């Protein structure tokens, strides 16, 4: 298998909800493992997500988990997930769903470099950038 680089998101207790949201946005197959399935009997953790992985038909892989007690959950603004390509309908569809219930920081519109570009933070605090380029011949 070739090496891959995949985003891994940490959530403050709502990983299942967030990963199911991304599955609705991107499609694909979602697998989850709870702390309970891995042997934890702590009632606060039994149903929380120890690891989730969403693999889509488009080749996207998103992973995530709930933050376990004793570990820090400190969302930042130093990383965003970038979606880019020239399939305008597909990318606008992702944009609309990701921005719904979130905060649009840069509206998805034509930019000075000629592409459509926008930035948002989704309802789970994850930053997204969408760039719709012109089809290249």
Please tell me what each predicted stretch does.
Residues 45-46, 74-77:
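Short glycine/proline-enriched turns and hinge-like loops at secondary-structure junctions
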Residues 7-9, 79-81:
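A structural signal for short, well-ordered beta-strand segments
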Residues 2-3, 31-33, 50-55, 60-66, ...:
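Vicinal oxygen chelate
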